């Protein structure tokens, strides 16, 4: 693998994620108030893990919360999508759609610390340059960026920016909100569909190397439902303008991209990795944009 540049070593976004695990408390059925409080705390953990946004420090942090917080990753996607959509709208007032798309994409990268983009680049390097499972995992752990990673990352950014710039303003805003939310839901579906395929002792987030439960999957889906309700309330004309067939196409393409990554990771690594999840998020987000940007002739 041709080594082009060095990336900074991957460190936890907040050192509070490394605090020792407190003694376990006796299990008991929580009240509604306790349940809501716990889910809110998990949402903040998810925000802390996936973004650079400041969140309150946690007393008696439990590492298991990180795994549990994965059900709120689509909620973080909704937050990121809303913020990126706002930046795109502001940019479109002052600049051309292309410049607005560039600014919005750069803002999203800054907001998330290139978390998913890094996974895409590492996956391209590993899956492109590794002939065996062991060699692929070794390349993916390498902090240096190779040719496959550069080409994959640049291609993804160019496609994403071009698609957003080609859409009408309101459609691009809706696409950002739905795309960021749905892609993270599709991404974490691999936690249920695949076992962990990396070396558990080298996992970037060891508590994440576990499968989602059906209940967690249901809570994750609720975030996409909330995103859908928001865009219907805020942009009813745009939702109608896009049309049912185009919505179905976007959803289908997102599922196809996710299933492609599922098959690829299962064949090459016998399961998912953190980098593989990041690549899945990026590819499914782009696939959704393709569906919403496509011109479907009326039959």
Named regions from a protein language model:
Residues 126, 137-140:
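Cytosol/matrix-facing amphipathic helices and coiled-coil assembly/linker segments
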Residues 2-113, 131, 142-299:
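Hydrophobic alpha-helical transmembrane segments
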Residues 118:
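Glycine/small-residue-rich loop that forms an oxyanion/phosphate-binding "nest" at active or ligand-binding sites
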């Amino acid at each position: 693998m041709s080594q082009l540049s060095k990336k900074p070593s991957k460190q936890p976004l907040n050192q509070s994620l490394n605090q020792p695990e407190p003694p376990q408390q006796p299990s008991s059925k929580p009240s509604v108030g306790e349940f809501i409080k716990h889910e809110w705390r998990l949402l903040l953990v998810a925000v802390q893990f996936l973004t650079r946004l400041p969140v309150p420090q946690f007393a008696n942090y439990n590492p298991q919360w990180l795994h549990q917080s994965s059900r709120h990753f689509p909620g973080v996607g909704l937050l990121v999508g809303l913020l990126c959509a706002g930046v795109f709208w502001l940019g479109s007032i002052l600049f051309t759609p292309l410049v607005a798309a560039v600014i919005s994409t750069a803002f999203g990268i800054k907001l998330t610390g290139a978390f998913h983009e890094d996974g895409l680049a590492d996956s391209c390097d590993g899956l492109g340059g590794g002939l065996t499972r062991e060699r692929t995992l070794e390349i993916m752990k390498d902090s240096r960026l190779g040719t496959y990673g550069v080409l994959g990352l640049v291609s993804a950014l160019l496609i994403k920016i071009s698609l957003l710039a080609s859409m009408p303003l309101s459609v691009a805003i809706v696409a950002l909100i739905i795309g960021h939310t749905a892609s993270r839901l599709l991404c974490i579906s691999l936690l249920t569909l695949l076992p962990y395929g990396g070396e558990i002792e080298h996992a970037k987030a060891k508590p994440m190397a576990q499968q989602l439960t059906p209940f967690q999957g249901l809570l994750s889906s609720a975030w996409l439902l909330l995103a859908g309700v928001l865009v219907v309330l805020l942009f009813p004309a745009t939702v109608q303008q896009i049309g049912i067939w185009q919505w179905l196409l976007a959803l289908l393409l997102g599922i196809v991209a996710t299933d492609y990554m599922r098959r690829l990771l299962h064949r090459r690594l016998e399961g998912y990795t953190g980098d593989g999840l990041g690549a899945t998020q990026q590819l499914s987000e782009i696939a959704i944009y393709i569906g919403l940007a496509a011109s479907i002739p009326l039959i």
